Amino acid sequence: FASDPIDMNIGIDNVAAMYELTEMLIQRGYQNIGLLCANQEQWIFQQHLHGWYKAMLRHHMSPNRVINAALPPNFSTGASQLPEFLLAWPELDALVCVSDELACGALYECQRRRIKVPDDLAVVGFGDSDVSRVCQPPLTTMTVPHRKIGSEAGRALLERLNQGNWSDRKSIASSLCMRESC
């Protein structure tokens, strides 16, 4: 959700989604988890970071393995930032990326460096984009139901036009899509 919307606010709960994604890795036994962010709206970054911190601190784990790159959230950034993580935190055993494109870029860099995913390093993304299904290994990701969000936004707009009212906030559920990268 936008932190300060002008009017209607329809979307997923980014805090809860990032919490669930991070919690899943912790439950699977990962101990040294990093978070890779890239240029995105400040409010989205804050929500992702809040969900991340909440999960990490709940388990008394260090939430300090975070890189917020001032670069676009694409394949190249994911590939270029993985070495930065490994240099700063060689003990890294899992990487949460705020987009599937970042995660797939990190996966490509893992392949180039002969890092076995998920045996040596788990990598997860966010968004369930088409590329998450075809990268190798297929990417575990958080599904963002874009069609449903769009449908609800259209419905809300019609309700507003026809009836003059609408609740200002509606949460659409995201879901974890487990694949082979963790």
Listing of model-derived features with the role each one plays in the protein:
Residues A2-C182:
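Bacterial carbohydrate/catabolite-sensing allosteric modules
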